[in-house]
Amino acid sequence: MTKITVVGAGSWGTALAMVLADNGHDVRIWGNRSELMDEMNTKHENSRYLPGITLPSTIVAYSSLEEALVDVNTVLLVVPTKAYRDVLQEMKEIVTEPITWIHASKGIEPGTSKRISEVIEEEIPENLIKDVVVLSGPSHAEEVGLRQATTVTSAAKRMEAAEEVQDLFMNSYFRVYTNPDIVGVELGGALKNIIALAAGITDGLGLGDNAKAALMTRGLTEIARLGRKMGGNPLTFAGLTGMGDLIVTCTSVHSRNWRAGNMLGKGHSLEEVLESMGMVVEGVRTTKAAHELAEKMEVEMPITAALYDVLFNGNNVKDAVGSLMGRVRKHEVEAIPDLL
């Protein structure tokens, strides 16, 4: 039995805590809302982020990070990307032994454009790190909470570490594959949020299935193009953390990025969208980070650039569609050398 603390009591952190508890592990979860932690301990529900789901009674919730981390050998980080450094800086003052650091957040750090595993390795002293592992894939928290069949990927530089995390989570409804490509797995999970925002805009504008299919396909090309430039394996983007996550995030009403894009497509301002969502929309920050990376690394990402102009330069969504459709004609196969 592994002693594991889930850091972050949002919908995804709560759902993953359920998986771990179902597997018989000693599971604690930390959140900064004391009233929510009290509810999880007494009513076994997270009514704010995962309403209507009864949590295993063995999950113990803490509002004190120090108490939550006593004697643990594994932590699972599921917090917004912008909060990582603050949380990690607090954790490194508490942890005293090398432990496994798993993260299940899909985003790129604002300001630095770093992957989350890079942030962990920068902030946590080497003597406190046993392994850093990424857990990612097509996985809505609402469905995992209902114990519906879900498949994800565990990625680490050391394959034994990825397999250990695979064993932690795997059960009859939660299947886990392994992948040594930590760069590709992280980037696929983060960058698909950009395309999900654009897919929501497409649906909000009522552009139809043809346009959405083209957007998703060309969007995957952009993801793989940047991913390869950053050291990812192109084949990773055809797997669960690339195409798989892209499909589920671009087509489901559970996707907050799709919902945000849908509102933008229907004429709402970004400020109105973010205020109404009530939860983090990682795709907004990731669009900015990816656009900056693309310019720095000289990678062509026209969909990302068009969305960046909508979100941060006030461009009209219909004009953005027109600019993409009016680009210089090209051979589709021109993308292939970037992928192989």
Curated annotation (Swiss-Prot):
NADPH binds at residues 11-12, 33, 106, 141, 256, 280, 282. Pathway: Membrane lipid metabolism; glycerophospholipid metabolism. Keywords: Cytoplasm, Lipid biosynthesis, Lipid metabolism, NAD, NADP, Nucleotide-binding, Oxidoreductase, Phospholipid biosynthesis, Phospholipid metabolism. It is found in: Cytoplasm. GO terms for cellular component: cytosol. Pfam families: NAD_Gly3P_dh_C, NAD_Gly3P_dh_N. It comes from the Bacteria. InterPro entries: 6-PGluconate_DH-like_C_sf, 6PGD_dom2, G3P_DH_NAD-dep, G3P_DH_NAD-dep_C, G3P_DH_NAD-dep_N, NAD(P)-bd_dom_sf. GO terms for biological process: carbohydrate metabolic process; glycerol-3-phosphate biosynthetic process; glycerol-3-phosphate catabolic process; glycerophospholipid metabolic process; phospholipid biosynthetic process. Gene3D superfamilies: N-(1-d-carboxylethyl)-l-norvaline Dehydrogenase, domain 2, NAD(P)-binding Rossmann-like Domain. HAMAP family: NAD_Glyc3P_dehydrog. This is Glycerol-3-phosphate dehydrogenase [NAD(P)+]. It comes from Bacillus cereus (strain G9842). The lineage of its organism: Bacteria, Bacillati, Bacillota, Bacilli, Bacillales.
